[in-house]
């Protein structure tokens, strides 16, 4: 990511929206809004549907050693609002 894009994109790790994770394990949104075990593929697809221009990076979440991958998305509103939107879109995709 170049310096001129700094501040215009946010990082989304699956743990941020995972209802199976506690707040101390990295969940950022409320349990009621989170989804169980979101995959990188689902996050990318949901972000595409929302027009957030996702970009995959093979980095692991510092708090958790298992699982690799994070997604950078356009910051079109606040971080928590975007995370809730992505989780909601994943819920819709799962039916």
Swiss-Prot record:
Q: GO molecular-function annotation terms?
A: 7S RNA binding
Reading the lineage from the top rank, the first entry is: Archaea
Checking Gene3D superfamilies in the record gives: Signal recognition particle, SRP19-like subunit (3.30.56.30)
Pfam families attached to this UniProt entry: SRP19
Supply the NCBIfam families for this chain: PRK00754.1
* Function summary: Involved in targeting and insertion of nascent membrane proteins into the cytoplasmic membrane. Binds directly to 7S RNA and mediates binding of the 54 kDa subunit of the SRP.
As for family, the record states: Belongs to the SRP19 family.
Record protein name field: Signal recognition particle 19 kDa protein
């Amino acid at each position: 990511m170049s310096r001129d894009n700094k501040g215009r994109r946010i990082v989304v790790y699956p743990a941020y929206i995972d209802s199976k994770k506690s707040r101390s394990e990295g969940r950022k949104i409320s349990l009621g809004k989170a989804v169980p075990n979101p995959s990188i593929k689902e996050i990318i697809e949901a972000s595409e549907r929302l027009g957030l221009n996702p970009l995959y990076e093979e980095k692991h979440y510092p708090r958790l050693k298992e699982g690799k991958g994070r997604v950078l998305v356009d910051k079109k509103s606040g971080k928590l609002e975007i995370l809730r939107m992505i989780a909601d879109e994943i819920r819709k995709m799962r039916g």
